[in-house]
């Protein structure tokens, strides 16, 4: 989709958004370490007809830009996709990079859909599902060597419907 643009907070290699930059350099924007400004840029792009995918570490995306996400994306229901990378305690970068409150911050916002895939295969389905939603979405993305696998989960992701995972 030529309307899709990518924005990153100076973390292209770490979040693998450099792959988009290489494929579509004119649709890739690096805001530097200025997450709040990046949300404002994404809001303006969405109002102009683009579909921004904003990518940063979960902790920085949700904490540093919470007010902008609420006022510029969630309340006006703008079509912006937020991809928060390394949520929870999974990061090796220490407490400053641990997003333990990102779900609480995003869950209270109106009009915002939250999607958290459980595996690499489901991540691809989650991104496709997010792209189909006309409105703001928070994708909570993990990078973990542990794979939670369930064929039904990987094949049939339906936003708003949970699936059971069985630990074997």
What does each of the following model-derived ranges do?
Residues 166-168:
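Conserved small/polar residues in nucleotide/adenosyl-binding loops
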């Amino acid at each position: 989709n030529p309307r899709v643009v990518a924005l990153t907070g100076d973390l292209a290699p770490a979040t693998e958004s450099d792959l988009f930059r290489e494929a579509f350099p004119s649709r890739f924007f690096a805001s530097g370490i200025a997450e709040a400004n990046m949300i404002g840029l994404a809001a303006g792009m969405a109002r102009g007809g683009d579909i921004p995918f904003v990518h940063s570490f979960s902790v920085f995306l949700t904490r540093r830009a919470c007010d902008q996400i609420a006022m510029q994306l969630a309340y006006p229901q703008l079509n912006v996709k937020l991809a928060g990378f390394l949520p929870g305690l999974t990061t090796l970068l220490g407490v400053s990079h641990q997003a333990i409150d990102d779900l609480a911050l995003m869950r209270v916002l109106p009009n915002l859909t939250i999607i958290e895939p459980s595996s690499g295969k489901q991540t691809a389905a989650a991104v496709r599902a997010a792209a189909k939603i006309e409105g703001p979405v928070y994708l909570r993305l993990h990078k973990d060597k542990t794979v939670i696998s369930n064929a039904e989960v990987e094949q049939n992701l339906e936003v708003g419907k949970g699936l059971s995972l069985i630990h074997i």
